[in-house]
Amino acid sequence: GIADVIPFQTPETKKKCKYLFVEADEDHIAEQHGRWSKENKGFISRLAYIYEYKQENPKVKGRKELVNTYYFSGLYEGSKGVRAFWEEVQSYIEATYDSDELQRVFISGDGAAWIDSATTYVDRSLYCVDKFHMTKYINAAANQMLDEAEEARANLYKFIYKKQRSKFKKYTEEMLASASNPEPIYELQSYALGNWNAVMRSYHNKLLTGCSAEGHVSSVLSDRLSSRPMGWSQIGADRMSKLRCYERNYGREKLIDLIRYSREQRSMKRKGTDNIAVEKVSMREIMTDQYDQS
C-alpha cells in the first residue's frame, strides 16, 4: 500500500540553517467500518510541518508565507506511534540540514501531550505554545468577569509580558472567587501555568511570530477527511493523510509517479516478476485506487 512505499528524497547537499520551525496539530476524523453506528468511533490524524522562515506573500499584502515547508502526517496511534512520528521528523532534519549549523528547532502547538513530547525525539528542540490557543483561553476566562472583562484581559496579558508567573497565578485565583462559571479560568490556569516556559518563549522570543497549524490542518487534512459528512477506515485515512502531504512536498506529477510505482510493486508481488509495463494514471484513478485499498 501507499503507506509502505512513500520514499524520502535525500538531498545531494545538506542545507545550512540556524533555526527551524515545526508546527503541529491534529484532525478529528469520523470512522466508518461497521454497519451499526455504535461500531464506528473517531480517531485522529497527526500533522506536522517544518519550515525555515516566513516572508511576505507577494500576492497577498500583509500576509506571510512559509518558506521551504515539508509535511508529515498519518494516524501514528499510541505512544509508539507518536515516537515513530517524531523520529521521522528528526530523520528528515538530519538528512536535510547541516547539524553543525543548526542551533535550534522551535516546536509550536496547542499544548497536546503528543506535540509537547517532540522535544524528547527532536534534537535541539524547544516547545512553544500556540498564541492562537492562548488567546482563546485568556478571552474565555476574562469574559467570566462580565463588566470587568476588558480589565481582566489586560491584566492577564500584563503579567505575561512582564514574566510575572506568581502574579498571574494569584490574579486568576482572585478571578475564581467572583466567576459565575469557574471552568474557563481553571482551563487557563492549567494551560498557562502548566506550560509557563513555553508561554514565555512564544511571547518574548522575536523569532517566533505565531503558529498557523490550525489553518494547515484545515487545508491539508480536513478539506478531504473531515469537513464534509463522511466516514473513513483507519487504513484509508492514514493513506490519504500521507498522500496529501506527499503532494504538498513534491507536487502532483510526483504523486502520479508514486501511485504508478505502488501499483507496480503490488503487481510484482502478485506475479512474482519484475517485467511490469508502466501505465498512465489519472488523478481520479489515484484517489479511487487508494480508497479501494482502504
What would you call each of these model-derived segments?
Residues 1-294:
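Catalytic center-proximal scaffold of phosphoryl-transfer enzymes
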